[in-house]
Amino acid sequence: MGVGLEGGDEPVGPKGNHAESCPPPLLPFTGGLPHKPRATDFGCSGQHEQHNGLENTDRFTRNTHAAIMPAGNAAGCRTVGGGMERIGFLSFGHWGPGQGSRTRTAADALLQGIELAVAAEELGVDGAFFRVHHFARQQASPFPLLSAIAARTSRIEIGTGVIDMRYENPLYMAEEAAAADLISGGRLQLGISRGSPEPAREGASAFGYSPQPGETDADMARRHTAAFRQAITGAGVAQADPRYAGGATGLLPVQPQSPGLAERIWWGAGTRKTAVWAAELGMNLMSSTLLTEDTGVPFHELQAEQIQRFREAWAAAGHAHVPRVSVSRSVLPIVDEEDNYYFAGSALRDGRDQVGVIDGLTARFGKSYVGAPDLLAEQLAADTAVQAADTLLLTVPNQLGVDFNAKLLGNIVQFVAPALGWSR
C-alpha cells in the first residue's frame, strides 16, 4: 500500500488482485514443485498483478541482458537532468516462513532493519524509512526500531512511511518521537497519515480509539494529528497540580521535547486535496506509488500535479521554512545474474501504471522500474513527479535479506542515482 492512502476498504486491483504499492509477504509453501521466486514475493514490486503461464523472457532479455555487468562498471550511465537531494530506502518489514524468505520471524525483520540501515549509511544512502502496519506480519511499533538504528548510525535520516494516526495516543507518541529524535541527534523524519486498508475490521477500536459522534476515521486521524503536533511544540496539555509541580499552576507540556521535530513531520497524502491541506498546516509531503483518484493522465503526471498544488499552497500559507517532498518508487536495476533471476518477471508484469478501486473510488497505481541501469536512469529522469521531489524513497524487497538489499542499494547509488543529479 502506498504511503498516505486515505481510503476505507481493501483496495482491489486489476483481475481482482489487491493493489498496494508493495505486495504482501510470501505465501506459505503448500507442496508441489517450488516456483521461481519473484520480486513480488518479497514485498518490492509496485503492483500485485501476476500473470499465469510462461513469462516472455525473450522480450525481457532484449531490454535487460546488456545490463548484466561486473560490479564497478558504470558503462551506459549518463547524466539526464535532475537534482535529487536525498535518496532513502523504504522497507515494508515483511516477515514470514514462506519459501525463499530470509526474514522468517519478527526478530529477523527488526534486526535486519537495523543492519540494513547501517549498511545503507555506509553506502551513502540518506534515509532509512519503515512502513507501519498493525495486525500484520510487518513493523507495528516503529520507535524502538528507529531508536536502535539511531544508536548504531550517525548520519542517515530515520523515518516512517507512514504511521496510522487512528491507532495513536497523541501524547504518548509525542514522548516517544521526541526520545527517538534526541537519540538520533535530530535525524527523525516522521511520516504520518490516515492509514491504509488493513486486515482488522475497526482495528483502531481494539486499541481503544473510535471516532467521536459525527466523525469519520479520517477525522479521528486528523484530530490525533493535531494533538500530537501541538504536544511536540511544547504546548501545555495537562493542568499542573501545585502540590507536585513545584508550585506551578499552568498547563504542563509532555517531556522530553526535541527542538525542530515539528518541522520534520510529513503527511502521507493520497489525493491532491489532502496535499493542499497538509501544506496549509505546514507539514511536509510524502507521496507514494498510489493515489486514490484518477484523472486519466499517467500516474507520474497526476502525482506531479499533486506536488505542484502542495508547493503553491505552502507558498500561499507563508510558512517560514522550506518544505520537503518525497515520492516512493520500486527501482530494480539488473546488474548481475542474481538480479535477473529475481526481477525478470517483474519487468513484464509491473512496468506500467495500473488502475484499481479503493472504497468505491478509482485509484491509479504507479509502475515499477526494472531493467538496465542506464534505462532506469532515463525513465526516472522522464518521471515528472520524481523530478519535482527532493527525496526519493526506494521500496526494497526486505525478505531477500540484508546482503541482497545492500547490494541493490549499492547498485542504485552507483549506476542510477548520479544520473538524477544525486551525489553522496
Please report, for each region that a protein language model flagged, where it lies by residue.
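Polybasic, low-complexity intrinsically disordered segments
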Residues: V3-L26, T30-D58
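N-terminal beta1-alpha1-beta2 module of alpha/beta enzyme domains
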Residues: N73-I156
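An alpha-helical appendage that flanks or caps ligand/catalytic pockets
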Residues: T79, P211-V254, S287-S288, T295-A389
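Flexible, glycine-rich active-site loops centered on histidine and acidic residues
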Residues: M84-A106, Y167-V237, E293
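Conserved, mostly hydrophobic/aromatic
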Residues: I87, G124, V132, I149, ...
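Hydrophobic faces of well-ordered beta-strands that scaffold small-molecule active sites
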Residues: I87-S91, A128-F130, I158-T160, L188-I192, ...
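Active-site mouth loops of central-metabolism enzymes
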Residues: G96-L110, I163-P170, L261-A269, R364-P373
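Glycine-rich, proline-tolerant flexible connector loops at the mouths of alpha/beta enzymes
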Residues: G127-L146, T289-H300, T395-F404
